[in-house]
Regions:
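Tandem repeat scaffolds
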Residues: 2-388
Length: 388
């Protein structure tokens, strides 16, 4: 069937073109939409071995294209709003600037598809394959991408406000400067994803996997990260104000110059993390794991570190004045020139800790274990300097 026959049959009132062979058809610019009478092209084949089907600017609003073969088709600026593309093959198709708002793309193959500047507002895309697709600057506000495959996809500066990414795969995807405000990312896979400068305000990342992700300057204000894995990620200059990080894994993360105002950190794993210069003053860090963490020049004054694990941590020149370190483990830690004035170290483990030049003036050391500790030049609780 060529374009002329299709249009003649359409003009005659025919709307059902299921199983039609439309290989190599050129329909641009056409209008296949009349009021509520949308065409049915179920299982239609619009492919040709050597030529791409051209549907540039075509109006297929509300069309039924279930399982249609549209791979490599040029649908740039086409209107597919409300269309049914369930199970359709759109692999490597061009949909730049297309209108797919409210379209049903459940299980569709959009791998390598060009969707930059496309409108996918409210689109239904669960279990869709968007691997390697370009969605840069696309609008996906409140779209459903649950369990979708977006590995290696480009979503740079995309509007992903309120999008459902639950259990989806975004590994190696680029979401640089994307707007993910209130996005649902529970259980999603973001291994080595680039979210630098992205906005994740109030986003839900509970139990999400962000291993080795680029999260520089990312905004996590009021985000839910409870149980999330951010191990080995770069969070430098990120904003985590009022975020929920309960039981999150931030081991070996880079956290320099981050803000943590009013955030929840109970049960968090910060072992091996780089927190140099970070302000954790007066934070509730009871039982926290900071083993082998880099905390040089960090501010932990007045922090609650009861039963915290700081074994092997590097705390040179850190401020822990007035900190609560009852039963804390500081064994084998580097505490060079640390300020522990008026800190409570009752029953703390300081075995083999290096307290050279430390300030312990007014500190409480009741039942603290200092076996093997180095105290040369340290100011002791009574104000005297240890010389031996």
């Amino acid at each position: 069937m060529d374009a002329k026959e299709l249009l003649n049959r359409y003009a005659a009132g025919e709307r059902d073109f299921r199983l039609a062979n439309l290989r190599g058809i050129v329909l641009s610019p056409i209008d296949l939409y009349r009021s509520s009478d949308a065409p049915t092209l179920i299982l239609a084949n619009l492919n040709q071995h050597q030529h791409r089907p051209y549907l540039i600017g075509a109006n297929l609003s509300g069309a039924d294209l279930t399982k249609a073969h549209l791979s490599r088709a040029n649908l740039s600026k086409a209107d597919l709003s409300g269309a049914n593309l369930t199970g359709a093959n759109l692999m490597a198709a061009s949909l730049s600037g297309a209108n797919l708002s409210g379209a049903n793309l459940t299980g569709a193959n959009l791998a390598g598809c060009h969707l930059n500047w496309a409108n996918l507002t409210g689109a239904i895309l669960p279990k869709a394959n968007l691997a390697g697709a370009d969605l840069s600057a696309a609008n996906l506000t409140k779209a459903d991408l649950g369990e979708a495959n977006l590995s290696k996809a480009y979503l740079i500066k995309a509007n992903l406000n309120g999008v459902n990414f639950k259990d989806s795969c975004l590994s190696l995807a680029s979401l640089k400067e994307a707007d993910l405000t209130e996005a649902q990312l529970t259980g999603s896979e973001l291994f080595k994803a680039n979210l630098a400068g992205a906005n994740l305000t109030r986003a839900n990342l509970s139990k999400a996997k962000l291993l080795q992700a680029n999260l520089r300057r990312t905004n996590f204000t009021q985000a839910y990260l409870n149980g999330a894995c951010l191990s080995e990620s770069d969070l430098s200059e990120a904003c985590l104000d009022r975020a929920n990080l309960c039981k999150a894994d931030l081991s070996k993360t880079y956290l320099r110059n981050i803000t943590l105002n009013g955030c929840h950190l109970s049960g968090i794993n910060l072992s091996g993390a780089d927190l140099g210069g970070v302000d954790l003053s007066r934070k509730l860090l009871t039982g926290i794991n900071m083993a082998e963490a880099l905390l040089n020049e960090a501010n932990l004054s007045g922090a609650y570190l009861i039963e915290a694990n700081l074994s092997g941590a590097y705390l040179s020149k850190a401020n822990l004045s007035l900190a609560y370190l009852i039963k804390a483990d500081l064994s084998n830690s580097c505490l060079h020139e640390i300020d522990l004035s008026k800190a409570n170290l009752s029953k703390a483990n300081l075995q083999k800790a290096d307290l050279t030049g430390a300030n312990l003036r007014g500190a409480i050391l009741t039942e603290a274990d200092l076996r093997g500790a180095k105290l040369i030049g340290a100011i002791l609780p009574n104000g005297t300097v240890f010389r031996h």
